[in-house]
Amino acid sequence: NLKIIPSKKEIQKSIRSLSPEIKKAIDETYKRVKDWHVKQKPKDIFYKDKFNNKFYYKNKSIRSVACYVPGNLPSTLIMCATPAIIAGVKRIVVCTPSLNGKLNGAVYYAASILGIKECYSLGGASAIMALATGTPKVKPVDKIVGPGSKWVALAKKKVFLEGLCGIEAANMGPSEILCIADSSSDSEIIASSCIAQNEHSPDS
């Protein structure tokens, strides 16, 4: 059984199971996501009017954020954590459930290249509550981001409405997609696009 806080040995073992191709894909994904979000970072503003009044608008990051990552989606961690890194958040946490008692090496490899060292092997609504309120083993955070099941989405909404923790959205549950196609479309590509969403939840 895995502990709530995986050991370095367990994490390294999971990462060693990855092929060079997977690592390269994760590296490239991080580079592309980072390049985009760097351009989005708002700039501080200093202004002095003709009466010598000085105005200063400073962007300041929150202290901590947790990235909730469904068990097999390193892309989710990259997309959630990269903006926080660029914003200057000092404490970034990853919370991801194990799958059949095993760590997902791709998620933990993504965490390693992002420089995230605080990792929790937890999932579901209980993970959201632990991150929002804290436990003897899980330190609370200021904000929780990332998708999950409908139970995760409801838990995020609850901790937000009770003033326990910030969230980025309350409706990031199972995916809802629409494929627009006509007689010229490839039916296999359309079907695979829909089937790909089933990894999120049976009711996606």
Role assignments for model-derived ranges:
Residues 115-203:
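Conserved NAD(P)+-binding/catalytic subdomain of aldehyde/semialdehyde dehydrogenases
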Residues 2, 45, 53, 57-60, ...:
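Flexible, active-site-adjacent loop/turn segments at secondary-structure boundaries
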Residues 85, 112, 132:
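Short polybasic/polar patches that bind polyanions
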Residues 1-63:
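N-terminal Rossmann-like NAD(P)+-binding subdomain of aldehyde/semialdehyde dehydrogenases
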Residues 6, 21-24, 28, 60, ...:
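Conserved active-site and cofactor/substrate-binding residues in soluble primary-metabolism enzymes
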Residues 47-109:
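Conserved small-residue-rich beta-alpha loop and adjacent elements
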Residues 35, 104-115:
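N-terminal small/polar loop signature for handling phosphorylated ligands or for N-terminal nucleophile
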